[in-house]
């Protein structure tokens, strides 16, 4: 998607449709006047409430005028960035449905909107650009088109150009913000592509290749450990999960170093289980196809590092991705096995479907021992219990640092990728005690997301600034959340906003 930012008014530019952002206040006073000035019928406003994300189409009466179509997008009271995000996302989604090639956004009110929002014009522009990218997303790379009898090659498959029109004196700020938003949006969509790929199209080695490609785009160093190196490092958690697989595991390190001295060094760890059958503790057949999404944490980390690099943020960001699939076979790990992780801590495997924490344990150990970063954050589709607790729209947050937890919460609010903190009290550690090993990998039916976090806490080696984000719900929601089925790329915006907060 190409970006154009112009001072020209939206009513006079070349575009297939012009998006007009309308608030509930504007609906009463200004919307009719605006439509008349553009030569469109006010009748389109009849049933329009201007709620956030609501759309209605109007048409200009004079033929030959460009843009002919006016897409009114509701922004509610216009006092929250999230309302603008919903509006731009909905408009882009509609544009793709209508096969609109050039979509323009009327930004003539940007200065006033920013004032109402108590933000800068570039921040608003970043939200609009990122949301348009998000709404325009379609995952169709695996469709051959051979059965599509109505296919029209003359019409655009998606939005080819996004135009910010009527920018006036805000042109420079809007251009800077829109460019940043396009970067974050493209990275989030790249994460969605990875998560949407089925297991037969994405192995651990393929995921490592995706990290290499991100490194080329972002200009950062990528190192991939093969099974031999993983074995030398004694990453017993990753190797145990991989025992049932015919595909080798990988351990990928992405290292973005800013120019000059970094303000902080941030380690991001992402769970990369490319398909999770549950192993010997086999999952139910219903819904198992969605377990291609069990590497959503890894996809998020890969693309957050890329976004940080392309935005040239002044923090060092190191991503770690342990990756394998989790399959049943004659060689797979079995319930009751005791394994030794890289840290030397032994784990009783009560359930082979609690595998994500095993590979994360080794990754956290490696990150702490080899880099000792200022902050460690892991993201994982870790527990169904987190969905039971919080539903699909919100991620679970666990941290041993209240200041870090607060920063993540605020970034969640700002980015629209919300997190909610759950406790890490010592009482929960009692639930993962083992009679035969140092720790058990499950804690029973109750408090499953908390006991998983307590398990991970044992592998941070006393690090004082660690957070765990359980994205099981919002990464691939089956209810609520994204209006587009499949992967959401949840966590990319959250992490980018967090990294920017240290800038």
From Swiss-Prot:
Active site: 283, 357
Disulphide-bridged cysteine pairs: none
EC number: 3.4.11.1, 3.4.11.10
Cofactor binding summary note: Binds 2 manganese ions per subunit.
Keywords (A to Z) from UniProt: Aminopeptidase, Cytoplasm, Hydrolase, Manganese, Metal-binding, Protease
Intracellular or extracellular location(s): Cytoplasm
Residue positions binding Mn(2+) 2: 271, 276, 294, 355
EC primary class: hydrolase
Binding site for Mn(2+) 1: 276, 353, 355
GO terms under cellular component: cytoplasm
One GO biological process term: proteolysis
Organism superkingdom: Bacteria
PANTHER family from the UniProt entry: CYTOSOL AMINOPEPTIDASE, LEUCINE AMINOPEPTIDASE-RELATED
Annotated family: Belongs to the peptidase M17 family.
NCBIfam families linked to this entry: PRK00913.1-2, PRK00913.1-4, PRK00913.3-4
Protein task: Presumably involved in the processing and regular turnover of intracellular proteins. Catalyzes the removal of unsubstituted N-terminal amino acids from various peptides.
HAMAP family: Cytosol_peptidase_M17
Official protein name in the record: Probable cytosol aminopeptidase
Gene encoding the protein: pepA
């Amino acid at each position: 998607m190409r970006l154009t930012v112009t001072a020209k008014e939206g009513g006079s530019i070349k575009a297939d449709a012009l998006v007009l952002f309308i608030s509930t206040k504007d609906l009463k006073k200004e919307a009719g006047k605006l439509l008349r000035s553009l030569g469109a019928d006010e009748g389109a406003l009849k049933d329009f409430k201007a709620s956030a994300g609501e759309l209605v189409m109007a048409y200009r009466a004079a033929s030959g005028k460009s843009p002919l179509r006016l897409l009114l997008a509701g922004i509610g009271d216009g006092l929250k960035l999230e309302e603008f995000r919903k509006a731009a996302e909905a408009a882009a989604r509609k544009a793709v449905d209508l096969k609109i090639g050039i979509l323009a956004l009327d930004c003539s009110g940007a200065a006033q909107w920013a004032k109402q929002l108590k933000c800068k014009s570039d921040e608003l522009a970043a939200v609009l650009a990122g949301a348009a990218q998000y709404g325009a997303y379609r995952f169709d790379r695996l469709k051959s088109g051979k059965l599509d009898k109505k296919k029209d090659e003359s019409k655009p498959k998606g939005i080819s150009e996004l135009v910010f029109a009527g920018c006036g004196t805000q042109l420079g700020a809007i251009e800077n913000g829109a460019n940043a938003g396009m970067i974050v949006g493209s990275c989030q969509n790249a994460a969605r592509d990875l998560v949407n790929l089925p297991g037969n199209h994405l192995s651990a080695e393929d995921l490592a290749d995706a990290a290499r490609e991100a490194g080329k785009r972002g200009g950062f160093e990528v190192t991939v450990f093969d099974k031999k190196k993983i074995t030398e490092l004694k990453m017993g958690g990753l190797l145990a999960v991989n025992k049932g697989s015919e595909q080798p595991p990988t351990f990928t390190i992405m290292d973005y170093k800013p120019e000059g001295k970094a303000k902080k060094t941030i380690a991001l760890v992402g769970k990369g289980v490319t398909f999770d059958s549950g192993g010997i503790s086999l999952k139910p057949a219903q819904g198992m196809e969605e377990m291609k999404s069990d590497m959503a944490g890894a996809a998020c980390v890969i693309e957050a590092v890329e976004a940080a690099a392309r935005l040239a943020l002044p923090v060092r960001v190191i991503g770690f991705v342990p990756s394998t699939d989790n399959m049943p076979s004659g060689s797979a790990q079995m319930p009751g096995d005791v394994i030794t992780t890289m840290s030397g801590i032994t784990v009783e495997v009560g359930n082979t479907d609690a595998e994500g924490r095993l590979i994360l344990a080794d990754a956290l150990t490696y990150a702490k021992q080899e880099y000792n970063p200022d902050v460690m954050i892991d993201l994982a589709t870790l527990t169904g219990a987190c969905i039971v607790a919080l539903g699909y729209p919100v991620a679970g947050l666990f941290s041993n640092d209240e200041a870090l937890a607060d920063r993540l919460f605020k970034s969640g609010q700002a980015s629209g990728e919300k997190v909610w903190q759950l406790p890490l009290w010592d009482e929960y550690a009692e639930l993962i005690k083992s009679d035969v090993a140092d720790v058990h990998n499950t804690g029973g039916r109750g408090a499953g997301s908390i006991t998983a976090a307590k398990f991970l806490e044992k592998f941070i080696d006393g690090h004082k600034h660690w957070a765990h984000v359980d994205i099981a719900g919002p990464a691939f929601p089956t209810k609520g959340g994204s209006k587009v089925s499949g992967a959401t790329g949840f966590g990319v915006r959250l992490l980018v906003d967090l990294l920017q907060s240290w800038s």
